[in-house]
Amino acid sequence: MAKGSSQGSRSPSQLIDGRIEELGDWRGQTLSRLRALVKEADPDVVEEWKWRGVPVWYDAGMICTGETYKSVVKVTFAKGAALKDPSGLFNSSLDGNTRRAIDFFEDEKIDEKAFKTLVRAAVTLNKSKA
């Protein structure tokens, strides 16, 4: 993000674009690809910018967040504990009753088909409870 730029005048999608550009490394590339997969899985998805800089995707409720850390890009599914995960993508936040997360590490290949299946399942769950 450019110094002095106002977050208030930028849309959530523009803020996410800025975060991806700001990262400028494998984390930005990974977040960008995961974002594209969410949009492919759910063309009606709405992007938000929450909690001082976390991309969040919604459709009839929160689907997932995209957090970036020094050594991991974490996608947390808000209702992940209620989702079937036959491909075993969930590898983080496994002990809770509600959320589940996937930690993506540098040079890790994304199972795109399985990821999009989880996104679609999360949307279906949200819509069933709406």
Annotate each PLM feature.
Residues 1-130:
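Charge-dense, helix-prone N-terminal extensions
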